[in-house]
Amino acid sequence: AEEVDASDVNDIRALIRKAAPDIVVNAVDPRFVMPIFLACEEEKVNYMDMAMSLSKPHPEDPMNKPGVKLGDEQFAREANWIQNGNYAVVGMGIEPGMSDVFARYAEDELFSRIDYLAVMDGSNLTVDGYDFAPSFSIWTTIEECLNPPLIFEEGRGWYTTEPFSELETFDFPEGIGPVECVNVEHEEVVLIPMKVKAKQVRFKYGLGAQFIETLKTIHTLGMDKKEKVKVGNVEISPRDLLASILPDPSTIGDLMHGKTCAGTLVKGLDKAGKPKAVYIYNVVDNHWSMKNYGNQAVVWQTAINPLIAMELIANGSWKPAGINGPEWFPAQPFLDLIVEYGSSWHIREEDSKGIVI
C-alpha cells in the first residue's frame, strides 16, 4: 500500500511511474477525478472510474440551463487519449455503470423505440442508532442531490430543473416497497443519450421523505457549502465538517439492515411495435453482502462493476478506445458475468399506461 495526495497530479504521476500499472482504477471521492484522470493522461496509462468530473452550474440560469455537465471536463480531452493510444472507461460503478448497461440492453434486445428512460434508485436500508446516516459519502450525496437535476429530451437536449422536483412514489422490487423518488443530477443522464436513442432520460433517487427534508435543512443552514468559512482562528468547509460528524459509510455495515436496488425503467415500443415497459434491476441484501464479503450492500454493489469491466476488456469482449461510458459496449457479456460474480439481474414487466411522461 502507498499513500498519495489524490489532489496532486504530480504526486499521482510519481506513484504511477513507480507502480507501472496497466490501468488505474479511481475509487475515491469525485472531487479527485480530474487530478487522477490528468495524471493517467500525462503518464499514458489506461483509466477507469465510478463517477465523473464534477458539474458547474450555469452562471445566469442554473435551474433551467446546464453549465458544465458531469464528465464534460473528461470528454473534452478525448483527442489526447486517442492520440496516446489509451482508453478511459468512465462511470463504471453501479449508478452510473450497471444502470447504463441495462439501458444498452433495453435498446439492443427489448425495444424498437424508447420514449422514456429513468434510472430509479431506492432502498429500505436502516442503520441502528442513527436517524440520518447515508450509506455512501455525504459529500457526494449533497453534491448530486442539491445540484440542479439534469434531464435530457429529444429535440431539446439537456436542461435542468429545481432540486427534489417531480416527486413520485415508485414501488421497488424484492420487498423494498414504495419509496418517494425525486429528480437528481447523475452521470447516466449525460452518458445514455450519447449512445442510446431515447426520447427522454432522467435519474430519480428514492431518498424518502425524511431524507429529503434533512437535505433541505442542510441546504437552508448553509451546511452544504464547499467554500471554507472562518470559525475563530480556523478555516473549514461546512460540508467537510458535516462529513466528519456523520458516521463513515465504510464502518456501518454491521449496523445496516435491508436491501438496496439500482435499476433502469424503460417505456416505449417492443421489437414488434407494441407498447412495452420494464424495470431492469439489481438488488443486494446487506445481510448477504456482509456475511459473504464483509462489505455493506451499497459498497459491494458498486465495487463489482469495474472488476467485471476489466475482465471483459482483458478477454477482448469490450474494446475501449478514447473515452467511453458503459453503454459504448455490448451489454450481454457484462450481464452474464454479473451472475458469475455472485450477484443477479432481473426484468420486471411494468404497466406501460401507468408511466406518465
Describe the function of each predicted region.
Residues 33, 53-61, 95-97, 124-127:
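Short gly/pro/ser/thr-enriched loop/turn and capping motifs at secondary-structure boundaries
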Residues 50-86:
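Rossmann-fold NAD(P)-binding glycine/threonine-rich loop
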Residues 3-21, 28, 32-35:
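Conserved Rossmann-fold cofactor-binding substructure of NAD(P)-dependent oxidoreductases
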Residues 2, 89, 202-204:
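General small-molecule cofactor/ligand-binding pocket signal
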Residues 24-26, 48-49:
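Redox-cofactor binding/interface segments in oxidoreductases and associated redox assembly factors
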Residues 73-124:
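Adenosine-phosphate binding glycine-rich loop
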Residues 108-357:
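C-terminal catalytic/substrate-binding lobe primarily of soluble NAD(P)-dependent oxidoreductases
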